[in-house]
């Protein structure tokens, strides 16, 4: 038996299982084909001319405000932008209304045929397109982690070569976040100042998280296949 994590290993051991092997968590392995959906040429041109200093991924209410607070403190140049990808995209108009008092120019993705060049925030309001935008950011905040929600899966962000920033509430993906933290791919903050300090320090750092995860996942897949071959 090959439990996916230490917690499952412990439960199975208590139940009397003896032949247990920790081969690694298969959730870390991405066996899906890359999406063939790409940005339109005008959108590609826009993002190449900008620098995404932060992406808020799978955000929940109040977390967009947090991302904007961070963005306004770290932004140095006009071509630096914030990307927001809410967990529930139907909240897009509510988010725009919520941020009105900030006097920032927000562009919705569904209006992206003609992107305003002077925008501050690019807001994704469609499902199934997040991965296309994650690749443009080196630092990604994963939502559901400031509020008591339990966090969101950070692996898509890591696979797009980003460092993950998150709050303390990640119990739904506890082992994955612990693993990423150990590998220095993710960072947990307790308050706004901690998050701000970390981003300022990491803003110009180039860490190949994609390669790190690929190496680890390849090892897990190899060990799992070797173990399965014993029973074929």
Feature names for model-found ranges:
Residues 1-232:
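Nucleotide-activated sugar donor-binding and catalytic core shared by glycosyltransferases
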